[in-house]
From Swiss-Prot:
Pfam families: T7_gp14 (PF24072)
Source lineage: Viruses, Duplodnaviria, Heunggongvirae, Uroviricota, Caudoviricetes
Function: Component of the cylindrical core that assembles on the inner surface of the capsid during capsid formation and plays a role in viral DNA ejection into the host cell. The inner core is composed of stacked rings of gp14, gp15 and gp16 proteins. Following binding to the host cell surface, the internal core is disassembled and gp14 is ejected along with gp15 and gp16 into the infected cell. May form a simple channel spanning the outer membrane.
Keyword Signal among UniProt keywords: no
InterPro entries with a match to the protein in the record: Gp14
Cellular component GO terms held in the UniProt record: host cell plasma membrane; membrane; virion component
Keyword vocabulary terms for this entry: Host cell outer membrane, Host membrane, Membrane, Viral genome ejection through host cell envelope, Viral penetration into host cytoplasm, Viral short tail ejection system, Virion, Virus entry into host cell
GO-annotated biological processes: symbiont genome ejection through host cell envelope, short tail mechanism
Species this chain originates from: Escherichia phage T7 (Bacteriophage T7)
Protein name, as recorded: Internal virion protein gp14
Subunit structure: Interacts with the portal protein. Interacts with gp15.
């Protein structure tokens, strides 16, 4: 009768092991999918940051070219003013004022170019920073939502606990007793006296 009680215990242990194996595979698949998603988010963020860096570089080159052009115009204008003043033989505060006004105009234009570049760069930098922080928080959430695998010891002890519990309940019900409390019916056997 011992084997009749041991079979369900063994089956429950096998089911527990099978369930743990299926759960471990599911957790591993979810973890792998989460990590692939995190890598894709990081790749997209890197591409976006590279694109924004190229935009910032382009804005810098545009501003540099515009400043170079303005400096050339300034040199020509100041040279023309000096030549005109020299040819007219005029001197004094009025002539100095004409030079200062012309220089001030070029300085204001150069400052506008510089300010426009700074504004564009700040917008690009804010986009890079926002994209990077958003990606970091998404990746952090992916890693926080990962389920943890059971330890190897836990994977061994859980089925043993289930089997031990089944064995204890079977023992308590008397399934392992060598003397059975129920008698087998021999009524159906031919030629056997039943004592009636």
């Amino acid at each position: 009768m011992c084997w009749a009680a041991a079979i369900p215990i063994a089956i429950s242990g096998a089911q527990a092991i099978s369930g743990q194996n299926a759960q471990a595979k599911m957790i591993a698949a979810q973890t792998a999918a989460g990590r692939r998603q995190a890598m894709e988010i990081m790749r997209q963020t890197n591409i976006q940051n590279a694109d924004l860096s190229l935009q910032a570089r382009s804005k810098l080159e545009e501003a540099s070219a515009e400043l170079t052009s303005q400096n050339m115009q300034k040199v020509q204008a100041i040279g023309s003013i000096r030549a005109a003043i020299g040819e007219s033989m005029l001197e004094g505060s009025s002539m100095d004022r004409i030079k200062r006004v012309t220089e001030g105009q070029f300085i204001r234009e150069a400052n506008m170019v510089t300010e426009n570049y700074r504004r564009d760069y700040q917008a690009i930098f804010a986009q890079q920073l926002g994209g990077t922080q958003s990606a970091a928080s998404q990746i952090d959430e992916i890693y926080k939502s990962e389920q943890k695998q059971k330890s190897k010891l836990q994977m061994v002890l859980d089925p043993l606990a289930i089997m031990g519990s089944s064995a204890a309940s079977a023992y308590a019900s008397g399934a392992f007793d060598s003397k059975s409390t129920t008698k087998a019916p021999i009524v159906a056997a031919k030629g056997t006296k039943t004592g009636r």
